[in-house]
């Protein structure tokens, strides 16, 4: 089962007050409900592929309204042959839709969320919970990117969901998709806040555990990569220094170098694996700092490069014995 499915399953077990149940139901029906007419009856079908969600919608309707309710199961024949669960209402439909602020007399569908319906903070949470159950999704925190979204067919309703989420400072944004619109979150912290808002505590804890472990792994990897890069840089510098010193030795001899450069050159080729700090401690003329050693080695690099380019020892500032 996906992380999103586990999250929704957890939400279907929540105990809520009648007033919050009504708001949750309103969000779900607005987004997943369909109206048809037969023999002067208004029939409402609420459809989902999630059995737990179907049971919850059935139970909420049953608890709130004393009307006959059917629960049907259909088999999808295309692509994934999943079951489709339909909660069907054949009587009292118009009155229920008006009570849920989805319909206005005589038969006009409202396009957005009734502000009075979500005045209380708990009602706002309930509406977002219903919307997420209807058409929400959230990436597994172990995947490459954090992403939570709620899909809506109608732009005005999508904007209302975004505004509702941002009353909780979630920094939600909207985006047009091929067949509708989405309100989405990309920040891990905002996703955990949203899970807390809708009451998905277990999902929140799992998300946070995975996120913390993932962030720790990323930090360790960055540290290792940084240390590896520094180590490679140090090794490459040491190899270059030794090659340059050996070139000076084979062309003009180390004796041609000034004393302070001659001593460090001899120590470097005799101790290829030691650090600059350790080289500084080996000098018989007195301990020199790491930066001081690095400065002398850079001077040796410059001398070697100038000799390679064709300059004479005298031009480089070296004294070569004629004997």
Swiss-Prot record:
Transmembrane segments: none
DNA-binding region: 275-309
SUPFAM superfamilies registered for this protein in UniProt: Homing endonucleases (SSF55608)
Disulfide-linked positions: none
InterPro entries recorded: Homing_endonucl, Sporu_reg_WhiA_N_dom, Sporulation_regulator_WhiA, Sporulation_regulator_WhiA_C, WhiA_LAGLIDADG_dom
Pfam families for this protein: HTH_WhiA, LAGLIDADG_WhiA, WhiA_N
Keywords: Cell cycle, Cell division, DNA-binding
Name of this protein: Probable cell division protein WhiA
Taxonomic lineage of the native organism: Bacteria, Bacillati, Bacillota, Bacilli, Bacillales
